[in-house]
Amino acid sequence: MLYHPSVAPDLEWLADDRGLGIDDVITLHSEATYFAYATGFAPGFCYLGTLPEALQTPRLDTPRATVPAGAVAIADAQTAVYPCESPGGWRLIGACPEPLFNLSNAPPSLLTVGATVRFEPISETDFRALGGVMP
């Protein structure tokens, strides 16, 4: 996962709001192991928890009209990866370069209820090499 302000418009805000450095946010988010509690909202959208307390923050007051596929986001005590472009009110802190939902795959979603997930920080070079697109 790429943690970089160019793909994560709320990363700097979150660090400032929580009194943390960006590296602290990355460490806290990437060192936790998350449990997939439920799917919903959009096909392949998996609610992961529990977010470290230091990162827990409310949703945006006004949702964004468009959140790109692969956006890694947090809201309250949960984190998630948007599987497709959609509206969304979660705070964006990173991006996943690989698609998580594809109807051609069986099963179509890489994340399923009951799975455990960890986010591995990667460089911008690796993000691009894995198919990630920078804005």
Task: Label each PLM-derived region with a short phrase.
Residues 1-135:
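Glycine-rich active-site loops that engage anionic ligands at enzyme catalytic sites
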